[in-house]
Amino acid sequence: MEKDFWQGVREALPTALGYISIGLACGVVASPYLSPLEMALMSVLVYAGAAQFAMISLIAAHSSILNMALTVCLINLRNMLMSLHTSSDFKDASLAQTIGIGSLLTDESYGVYLSEKLKTDTITVPWMHGNNLVGYVAWIGATVIGTALGSLLPDPKAFGLDFALVAMFIGIFAAQFQGMQLTEKTKTMLMLMVLLAVAVSFFLLLFFVSQPLAVLAATLIGCFVGVVCDARE
């Protein structure tokens, strides 16, 4: 039975709660520099948690627009590989549908997508739109509210909001790791190979680049290894 839009929404609701927590924190951090309207425009057009936190830091440092653009591009390079892998399930979708899916794909919605893939081989376009849109709406609303109420919550770390994104990733990964028991041995080996590629790449890159760049580069290498190995099966 094919799953519809609202089933995609329901599958993504737990991650939407994480979006709200980290979105509020992002809004609070941005409140000294951006108005709620400006924050809304940033969330609508950029829609990338890590990139938006980086942009806010650069705005606070009076950095150039070119520097901000390059930073956002570097941080979001991994989305290209995630979109490339996701597109394999939507080869019959229209151009507008694939652009819509790729534009709103995030680490979290990609994680929900992978978890769903452990249960079924059929992912529909409406389901994916539901998965993506619930996070999009939650993020925009949370960042705007956080910016508006920023003066009331001057230190988001005091409430542990800065850990919300990390906790969300842990939850998504735990669900996928548990799902390994339901997959064939080759899929389990693929997941372990990707994790190994990320770990080895990270430690080797530390000898040549800074830690933040090593994290980004290792993530991209892991995504590339996963896409290539998955395509060969």
Feature locations, PLM:
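Alpha-helical transmembrane segments and their membrane-interface exit regions
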Residues: 48-51, 74-81, 167-174, 218-231
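Helix-loop-helix hairpins and the membrane-proximal interhelical loops
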Residues: 1-48, 55-72, 76, 233
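Membrane-interface elements of multi-pass transporters and channels
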Residues: 28, 32-37, 89-93, 152-157, ...
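Helix-loop-helix junctions within the multi-pass membrane cores of secondary transporters/permeases
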Residues: 70-162, 166
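Membrane-embedded alpha-helical modules
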Residues: 125-209, 214-216, 224, 228
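C-terminal ends of transmembrane helices
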Residues: 81-89, 114-117, 172-183, 225-233
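Alpha-helical transmembrane segments and their helix-entry boundary regions
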Residues: 39-42, 53, 68-69, 96-100, ...
